[in-house]
Amino acid sequence: MTLGLINANPVVQAKKEGLVRREDQYRDDGVDPLEIYDYVRDIRDPEHPYTLEQLRVVSEESVTVDDKLDRILITFTPTIQHCSMANIIGLCLRAKLKECLQLHYKVDIRVSPGSHADEVSVNKQLNDKERVVAALENPNLRQLVDECIYSDEI
């Protein structure tokens, strides 16, 4: 966590108890948006002791799945427009999905349109394979990502 808070007063919503699955939740031919959301909703924010779900950084509506093209799109909304943690949040989302999904899915992670001052730059970095690999090989960044994904504080 950072010493000086970037967003000292985030809006926090109550954590949902559980998600209701559709009837086809056990299908063998792919994943659905609710399943993907369930994977990422409990990731802890890098700055606050709240989940991405509680801060409304991610929502059920922010996940799109195209099984025909084996593509998943997650859009996330930083709590402030100048959020310096946007890249870390995106790395957390990507690392968690890499752990949970089969390799054949193409995952795009983007900040919601108009939600970040450096939207184009952040989106480019989060979807550049070489940059993502290099970032996750950095021990300090990897430790922060792992703390957010595997946090016991939640």
From Swiss-Prot:
User: Which Gene Ontology terms describe the biological processes this protein takes part in?
Assistant: protein maturation
S-S pairs:
none
Q: Name the SUPFAM superfamilies on file.
A: Fe-S cluster assembly (FSCA) domain-like
**Gene3D superfamilies in the cross-refs:** 6.10.250.1280, Fe-S cluster assembly (FSCA)
From what superkingdom does this record's organism come? Answer: Eukaryota
InterPro entries, A to Z = FSCA_dom_sf (IPR034904), MIP18 (IPR039796), MIP18-like (IPR002744)
Renumbered to this chain, the signal peptide range is none
Q: Which family does it belong to?
A: Belongs to the MIP18 family.
Q: What does this protein do?
A: May play a role in chromosome segregation through establishment of sister chromatid cohesion. Unable to complement ae7 mutants, and thus probably not involved in the cytosolic iron-sulfur assembly (CIA) pathway.
What name has this protein been given in UniProt?
Protein AE7-like 1
